[in-house]
């Protein structure tokens, strides 16, 4: 029982699930009566990790955003994975909204996580490794307590726990 146990904390979004959610959103868009004869588009840019929503009015853009979020939730992607970066006028009197996928654990949030773990005085060590935080300790119970602690932080990121060994 003297062996070391560990797990990794990261913030990643499964892009295949995002694609599937956007495809089902587009299918719902074609079936909805309130979008008949109205300009409405949903596009994904994998390179920039953004979702672009285009429609004729602000209310329609909000409705499209709600559709996308509901489909992402059904695919187990939390709504905190999206943040609206900008809303602007587009050609033809349309409105364009850009949603950014938050899927990287930056150094600021990594430091928040490691500080919270150290302040909890659990018998574990947390180290920042690029875009993830490695937590290691001798007791699996302490590691599970760390998972509960990080979930309680309510960070605006889709936090994932993986590689529990």
UniProtKB/Swiss-Prot annotation:
Check the record and name the Pfam families matching this protein: DUF520 (PF04461)
Record Gene3D superfamilies: 3.30.70.860, YajQ-like, domain 2
User: Which GO terms of the molecular function aspect are on file?
Assistant: nucleotide binding
Keyword tags: Nucleotide-binding
UniProt cross-references to InterPro entries, sorted A to Z? DUF520, UPF0234-like_C, UPF0234_N, YajQ-like_sf
Its domain of life reads Bacteria
- GO CC list: cytosol
Q: Which residues form a coiled coil?
A: none
- What protein family is recorded? Belongs to the YajQ family.
According to its UniProt entry, the function of this protein is described as: Nucleotide-binding protein.
Q: This chain belongs to which protein, by name?
A: Nucleotide-binding protein Ccur92_01650
């Amino acid at each position: 029982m003297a062996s070391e146990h560990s797990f990794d904390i990261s913030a990643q979004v499964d892009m295949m699930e995002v694609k599937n959610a956007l495809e089902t959103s587009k299918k719902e868009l074609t079936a909805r009566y309130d979008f008949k004869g109205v300009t409405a588009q949903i596009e994904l840019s994998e390179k920039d990790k953004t979702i672009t929503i285009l429609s004729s009015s602000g209310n329609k853009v909000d409705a499209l955003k709600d559709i996308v979020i509901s489909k992402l939730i059904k695919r187990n992607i939390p709504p905190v994975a999206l943040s609206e970066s900008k809303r602007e006028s587009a050609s033809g009197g349309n409105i364009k909204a850009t949603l950014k996928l938050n899927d990287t654990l930056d150094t600021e949030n990594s430091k928040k996580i490691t500080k919270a773990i150290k302040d909890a005085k659990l018998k574990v060590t947390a180290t920042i490794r690029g875009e993830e935080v490695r937590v290691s300790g001798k007791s699996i119970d302490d590691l599970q307590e760390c998972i509960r602690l990080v979930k309680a932080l309510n960070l605006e990121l889709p936090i994932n726990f993986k590689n529990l060994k």
